[in-house]
């Protein structure tokens, strides 16, 4: 099972964001889950929650403060829970994903100043569960982990941009003020795209990947507006 979210208060952003439906642009949340699984979303259903004020609802006609969806995948028994809000929720910024497996699970940090948590199921010599001290339930350990920077995988000329940017206190940009520079991903994306052109191959992520990442959110929002009706995600190949 996987869970992903993008929480961000958009008050004061440019007018084109005013009232934007939460899951119409879900890529910051769902992309890591779909990329890690290597699967395509097949169906999705979604419910809206809470109401925004009238002037926020007016531009796009979306009344919901929060949208949460459940995604089924083609040729997979894994489901993904996806959630996003943009207005009227008292919660700090995060772009996060959690992964729950039989032997290990990963949870994004609750606060951006913290580190993520890795949970591990203790296993015996024959891969059997080691029981906890009470004899009920397996023994699970947890540890805070440091995610590597991976700047060493980039040319030196752009590797520094995983942590530094062309923006500073005198020249800020909102994606860094609230988005933390998207985790240092910008130079990795640029490098991969340029290399794909030089090597005459499809980049990772591809245009088709992007269509699914965006399309599943559009379908989710349509589901919410229709009261939670299951929507089938189009095939983009």
Which residues are covered by each model-predicted region?
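C-terminal capping/lid region of NAD(P)-dependent oxidoreductase domains
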Residues: 1, 222-237
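Rossmann-like dinucleotide-binding domain that binds NAD(P)(H)
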Residues: 7-94, 98, 112, 208-211
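Short, hydrophobic alpha-helical segments
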Residues: 37, 190-201, 218-225
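C-terminal glycine/acidic-rich active-site capping loop/insertion
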Residues: 53, 57, 62, 70-75, ...
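Core catalytic loop region at the nicotinamide-binding pocket of NAD(P)H-dependent oxidoreductases
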Residues: 80, 201-205, 226-232
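Short hydrophobic/aromatic-rich beta-strand segments that constitute the beta-sheet cores
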Residues: 80-82, 106-109, 223
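Non-catalytic, hydrophobic alpha-helical segments
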Residues: 190, 210-213
